[in-house]
Amino acid sequence: MHRDMYSSRGTGYGQQQYGSQSGYSQNLGSGYPGSSVSGGAEGGSQISLSSRHPSITGAPQETDIGGGYRSHLSTAASHYGTQYGSVYGSTSLSSSQPLSTNGLGSSVLDNRSGYVPTLPDSPKFASGSYLSPSSHGYGQKTDDLYSDKLSGYIPVDRRQYGEQSSSYLGRELQNEPTRRYADPSNFARQTDLYDRIDQASLLRGEQLLKMQSLHTSSVDAGVNRQTDYLTERSSTVRHSDQEAMHYGGRLESDPHGLSVRNTSSYASQHTPSLLGAVPRRNLDDYIYPESSSNPGYGVSLPPGRDYGTGKGIHSAASLDLDYPGGMLARGTGAAPRVDDLRKGDRASYLREFDLREEERRREDQRARDKEREREREREHDRERERQRERERQRARDRERERILERREKERQGERERERKRALEIKRDRTPTARATSKDTKERTPVPKSISRDARSSSLRRDAHHREASIRRSSPIKPIRRDYVCKVLSSRLVDMERDYVTLDKRYPRLFVPSEFSKVVVNWPKQKLTLSMHTAVSFEHDYIEDGGADVKSTSTKPLALKTGGKSVWNAKMVLMSGLSRTALEDLASDKFFEDRIPHICNILKFAVLKKDHSFMAIGGSWDPTDGMDPSVDQSSLIQTMLRHSKDKLHLDLSNCRHWNPFLEIHYDRVGTDGVFSYKEITVLFVPDLSECLPSFDVWRTQWLAHRKALTERDRLLSQEVKKDTVEVTKDAEKKSPGDTSGTPTTGTKKTVKKIIKRVVKRPVNDGKATGMKGEKSDVPEHVAIPETTVPKEESTGTSSNKKIVKKVAETGDTSDPSAKANEQTPAKTIVKKKIIKRVAKRKVAEIDNKMDGDSKKDGDSDEKKVMEVGKKSSDSGSVEMKPTAESLEDVKDENASKTVDVKQETGSPDTKKKEGASSSSKKDTKTGEDKKAEKKNNSETMSEGKKIDRNNTDEKEVKEKVTEKEIKERGGKDESRIQVKDRKKCEEPPRAGFILQTKRNKDSKLRSLSASLDSLLDYTDKDLDESSFEISLFAESLYEMLQYQMGSRIFEFLKKLRVKIVRQRNQRKRHQEELSVKQNEAKSQDKRQKTAEHEDKEASVISESAPGKDDKETSGKETVDGSREIADKEAVAKTKETLGSKEVTVGEAVNMEVENQDEEDDDGDDDPEEDPEEDPEEDPEEDPEEDPEECEEMDVANTEQEEPAEEPQKKEENLEKTSGTVADPITEAETDNRKEERGPNDSKTEIKPKSETEKHGKQDGGTSDAAKREETVDKELLQAFRFFDRNQAGYVRVEDMRVTIHSLGKFLSHREVKELVQSALLESNTGRDDRILYNKLVRLSL
């Protein structure tokens, strides 16, 4: 039974062979004519299997086969009339292409409304891979297809298929029993289907023949995939309402009990793929499922062979994974359950989805890891960069610290040297320990007979020692200053500048938001500024009781005038450079404290309110004149009005006002819209025209000083009254004890008040003389109550002055006030005064060194020391003993007339001596010594007339002041003294007195500020007044830079012409030297030949026969031959010299002509010369020849030697020839010297330097050389304008920027050549520093 059922020659379900089936035999016969139906069935099945499954042979053939089938999908599907139609219909053939391309098409069932898939598709084989999109909609065209070709087939053969087809057509609808069987009338319309099947079979046969040659591999590899196809069909093609069976009617509870021998249903199976229907499956499909041994498509494979295991793309194991539940493994045993299929597909889909999700998560994780790695790398890079930056910052800090330490060491060394010098000077003055000792045995007396000589010798010894100490001190090593050069890189001659330009030019300048533009007037019109007129400004104030009248706002003024512009007129008063300042700018002195520069010499008078500078002036008023937009002369009236009102200054005599700047503002109203335009014009008047004469200025200045003195005196009296009241209150609070120590509170108040008192009387001392009040000094020294607190409170700066003032103000103050001025602070100061007296007294007695006064000096010394001890131990009680001790000292010293004569002298001379000895740089000359001797002699003669008490008091006073000078440092005090004396005695140069109004509300004051001070602004200066002053300072600095840069530019043009000319002359000179050397060599050869001929002739004459005849004839022949040789040599030398003269004369003429042409060209157009000359001589570029400057700086000795060699040779020729040179040769030598003159211009400086070195031997020559060496002071000032610290050089890059900023529109090559010429002339080409000290000494 099973053999019949599973026959190898029949179908897998007991069907007949292919030849017994009517539908397939017809199709097969038409596809394969001439072949036996029974014999060729198996072979045909094998061939068609490989051809119908192109996916078995692999991917390359799969794509070709799929491409061949694309156009014949519908026709090829009709070839299979039997059960193959459900498998190899349009779905199976179209599955080759989606498999090879991973097709994503949706299932046909998804596009139909009647069939909704209940099981999910396989993740690897989508539903669109098995169903062709061409099978859409199928039941509607069956009538049309069957009605055409019905008569072409036998009705008996069609009946069984039609009946079976009708049953299937009935099942296409919903599950209704009434529609199970279709109407038999439809069977008559199915004839057209078979015609189409015939045509498709023919085409299919042709395709199989074509594919047979391509497919030679076994069919076994595709069984696995075919099984996959069939399993997918069984799992997916099912309606949602149906049960486990597909299209086969309802099943019973036991599907295995059904009959399985109904072969008629299989024989008459239709092809629904042509109509687009879903392939129907029978019940046997589930009872006998497909497997590797039973494919299920009508043919059984040979026994013993399993073509599905381990072959194909997907093996059975992989299919088991794709379809879980062991469906393929149970394929031969029993039919799979639907629930298993459903669960297996869902599980596989979920597993595949999880795998894909996991893979996607891994990819995302890897991407995030990579991104984190990149971020870490970037962070590492940033960290390394930060580390490098920190290292660089540390290096910079270390370098800065090293620089600061080096500077600190230099300052410390300087202070140490200063201290050593001060100690040396002090050592010269202070007595020895032996002289100051108290023991009388140690002090050896000086004999009376030699006391006067000893004193004179000691004076001489002291003076000599002082001079030696000054001469012994080594000169101060100049401090090496840093190079500072401020050069603006922008174009200086731009007239109008907007907000962006200002922000770029001046980064530190705060520009107001309403600023629109600024117009600079100095580039377009020549301004007459008082640059060389020094003006002195005296600043004062006037008390104004009224309140400060605020100026009216500018906006109502603009509305009142009816215009849209508001004008402001302001000015800045400038003090120019004096003669001494100009000399300092061009001098070679070394300045320690303050380096002179134009920016710190120029002074400007401005106003200051709070912390901001203001220009002098205000807004324009219609009363000043016409509208400034029509006539700007009305602005001058505005300035005159404001200067009188604010400064009490009359400038009506000024003629040149010089409008310097115009600053424009666009004012915005409260509504945020443009309201009006405001224009501020800044003037710099020329004050040289309106300066008063010196006599008028002297009277004005003296009256002003007198008024100041009177005002200060009144203030001092008021303050004294306040101090008396304060001291009385303090005495009431603290009862008078024996110690007399004041409280801290009273001491502080007294100190504060006394400071003011001390500062005011300085003017009294300046205004009044000192000579008339010298006689009153003892009284005030004897009663030091008024002077004591002043000296104690002033500290360090004005102690010496106060001592003077006591003598001056003593007459004006009342004696009652003196008596009442006993303050508690007097005790502290008395100690110091007594100590000073004691010390100076000891020094005085020791310096006298008088042997007769030994005992008296000892007693005096003891008394003074006792006084000092008592004063240090006790308090105010010891005031009386101090006065008595002073009187005793005076009485005991009255008998010492010699000592008085020695010591008494004018206090002025002694002060001068102290000041000169304390200062470091002042040296005593012979005149000072003579003056000292005269003063000593005068004091010797006048000493008897002077009262002893007065002289002693003067000595005490002077010694106290000298001690104070020593404590404070004599250098600074002497300078201050000299300045104060000059201020007191002589008025400064002519100028103006600026008096501002002062009241409680106003803080406005006038002051003088340098250009550096005006340029020292910051971005925190937000006022418009500060902005205007700062902008004025920057514009003025640009004007100065333009002027100084123009000087340097003109000099560089001349220097360039000179260097090019010297280079051309040097080339010609070298060519001439080479020609002359060649001629000299040829001349030497001719001379040697002539001498050789002479020797031969003499030998021939000596070898003649006969002694007498030989001698006579020999002498004659020798003489004759010599005369002939001499004549020939002279002729030859004349010829050669003539030829030389001709050639050299022509060369000289050519040089003179070329030089004249060059001079003409240089005079006509000197700017073109630097460009043309390098083109004529491109070989010797200054950058390629850096050693030329060294030759020109030192001496051009290498050129002198070859120049002198031909001259020496010519002289030798003249000596040998015995002839005298013609005048032409002398002219030639003169011309040659003239030629060498401009070439060796630098060589003329060498003898000067040599004579300077040997100046001791030849003093006159060195002085003459110094006189001849001139310095261009204007050029030196220009260079030093850019070299702020006088380092001695200017860098090449700064010089290039300077020339570019002049606005001359020069090319970079021109500027480079100009600067390079200066570099090579002053320094080597390997350096970038132009040493301008050499350039200013050149004569161009």
Curated annotation (Swiss-Prot):
Record's keyword terms, sorted: Calcium, Coiled coil, Nucleus, Stress response, Transit peptide
Gene inactivation effect: Defective embryo arrested at cotyledon stage. Hypersensitivity to salt (NaCl) stress leading to reduced roots and shoots growth and altered germination, and associated with altered sodium (Na) homeostasis and over-accumulation of reactive oxygen species (ROS). Hypersensitivity to hydrogen peroxide H(2)O(2) and methyl viologen (MV).
Subcellular location per the Swiss-Prot or TrEMBL entry: Nucleus
Coiled-coil ranges per UniProt: 355-426, 1052-1086
Superkingdom per UniProt: Eukaryota
Low complexity bias (residue ranges): 7-39
Biased composition annotated in UniProt, kind: Polar residues: 46-60, 810-824
One Gene Ontology term, aspect cellular component: nucleus
EF-hand domain ranges (all copies): 1270-1305
Segments of this protein annotated with the region Disordered: 1-73, 161-185, 357-473, 723-750, 784-990, 1063-1269
Function comment: Required for salt tolerance and sodium (Na) homeostasis after salt stress. Together with BHLH148/RITF1, regulates the transcription of several genes involved in the detoxification of reactive oxygen species (ROS) generated by salt (NaCl) stress. Binds calcium.
Protein known as: Protein SHORT ROOT IN SALT MEDIUM 1
Gene that produces this protein: RSA1
